[in-house]
């Protein structure tokens, strides 16, 4: 008789490192994981580079990790695909990108390039912006404006100024483009329906509201002088003679060059959904091109790179064999155990049930609440294990990754300790019902919260992860 349920637990950002300095996992009191590692079989795994369909040396991330786990095989990622398209020239023949260019020429209008200005490779890559600038130049589009969203999570926290300088140098070399606005990803790339943040970025893009600066580099320097690093840069409009260089207007074209959907959906909906309700605004008709389809329910957009279908995912296999499955996470990682785990498919499989726990909204950053909503997730997990309703449960604990990204090591230690406590409760519940628990991670983060050469590090890393089985 087979054991039931089988629980696949993803400890997000919980990697392996031999070093203890800056290692929140090693610094934490983790009696449960320590005991499990001694008494049950665990193996070391890789969650970066070519092991997960990324370029060699490229760090992994939550999306990539969950997509590979859910597929049960290597899935070649959008970063690799788009970079290759630029290299072999197919990028410059892309019909949707060309449509944006043609619209600008037809209406003598502006081309706006939105996205995360970063070499992190998690949501975007700066080389893709260069490709768009080259394409605009080749197609005779002269009014090109980059609205740069600043990173500081997948790159060092104060690297944005350098990326802006690199971009402006490349613009001068190609002969087209200006930086028209800046905004930290905290505002421009929210994914948890914090519409007040998104609205601030949206207003800077469409009406020129927000801070003002005469140059993008000067704006970054001013932000750093106020101890506000990249992720939290307040939406800032670059001006000339006291007026914004450019804002998005009717008949303009927009290309959103992020390839990862979860943090591009809200801003895209604000621009494209003519029935938008997130905040008050007037719909602006544009030719709006997304690198990927961030959300099938968002209308009035073009998709530059169509989804490559991933067949026979773990969820599909379970459904085909009549198994009931539950996906459980808090909202910060809900898309990862559903959309990404299912190979980029939004709709659930047959007999796939989903349980969503709201992430905290009473704190601006999770170092102020390192437990996040893990206690509620853990309680729901134990109830689901004991319910006898599900054959398979896929569950994500977000804390090591989300709190690790804050760079506050004591908070990350508390996050790891809270997760350890909840793992213990899940282990006991699984044993009580004679089930099986697999523990793994999607990528590393909390085990290396400092750069051993430069100090603070908030970025994903290429450290190995682990997989264990408890039965």
Protein language model annotation of sequence segments:
Residues 324-384:
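Metal-dependent catalytic core segments for phosphate chemistry
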Residues 95-96, 389-422:
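Active-site His/acidic residue clusters
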Residues 412-455:
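Metal-dependent active-site segment of extracytoplasmic phospho-/sulfohydrolases and closely related
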């Amino acid at each position: 008789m087979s054991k039931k349920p089988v629980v696949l637990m993803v400890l997000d950002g919980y990697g392996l490192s031999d070093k203890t300095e800056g290692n929140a996992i090693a610094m934490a009191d983790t009696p449960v994981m320590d005991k499990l590692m001694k008494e049950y079989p665990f193996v070391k795994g890789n969650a970066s580079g070519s092991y997960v369909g990324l370029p060699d040396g490229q760090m992994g991330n939550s999306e990539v990790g969950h997509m590979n786990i859910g597929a049960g095989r290597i899935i070649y990622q959008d970063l690799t695909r788009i970079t290759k398209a630029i290299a072999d020239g197919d990028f410059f023949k892309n019909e949707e990108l060309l449509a944006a260019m043609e619209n600008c020429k037809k209406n003598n209008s502006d081309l706006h390039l939105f996205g995360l200005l970063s070499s992190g490779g998690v949501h975007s890559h700066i080389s893709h912006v260069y490709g768009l600038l080259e394409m605009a130049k080749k197609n005779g589009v002269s009014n090109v404006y980059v609205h740069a969203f600043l990173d500081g999570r997948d790159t060092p926290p104060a690297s944005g100024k350098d990326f802006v300088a690199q971009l402006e140098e490349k613009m001068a070399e190609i002969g087209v483009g200006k930086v028209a606005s800046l905004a930290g990803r905290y505002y421009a790339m929210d994914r948890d329906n914090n519409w007040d943040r998104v609205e601030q970025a949206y207003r800077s893009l469409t009406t020129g509201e927000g801070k003002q600066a005469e140059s993008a580099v000067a704006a970054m320097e001013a932000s750093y002088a106020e101890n506000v690093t990249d992720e939290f840069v307040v939406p800032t409009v670059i001006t000339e003679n006291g007026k914004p260089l450019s804002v998005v207007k009717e008949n303009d074209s927009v290309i959103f060059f992020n390839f990862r959907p979860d943090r591009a959906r809200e801003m895209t909906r604000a621009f494209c959904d003519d029935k938008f309700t997130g905040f008050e605004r007037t719909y602006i008709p544009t030719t709006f091109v997304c690198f990927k389809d961030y959300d099938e329910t968002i209308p009035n957009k073009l998709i530059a790179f169509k989804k490559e279908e991933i067949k026979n995912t773990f969820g599909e296999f379970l459904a085909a064999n009549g198994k009931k499955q539950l996906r459980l996470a808090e909202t910060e990682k809900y898309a990862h155990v559903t959309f990404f785990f299912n190979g980029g498919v939004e709709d659930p499989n047959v007999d796939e049930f989903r349980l969503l726990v709201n992430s905290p909204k009473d704190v601006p950053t999770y170092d102020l609440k390192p437990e996040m909503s893990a206690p509620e997730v853990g309680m729901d997990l134990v109830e689901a294990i004991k319910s006898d309703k599900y054959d398979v449960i896929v569950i994500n604990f977000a804390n090591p990754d989300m709190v690790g990204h804050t760079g506050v090591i004591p908070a990350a230690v508390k996050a790891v300790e809270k997760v350890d406590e909840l793992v213990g409760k899940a282990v006991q519940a699984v044993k009580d019902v004679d089930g099986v628990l697999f523990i793994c991670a999607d990528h590393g983060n909390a085990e290396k919260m400092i750069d051993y050469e430069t100090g603070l590090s908030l970025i994903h890393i290429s450290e190995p992860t682990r997989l264990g089985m408890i039965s």
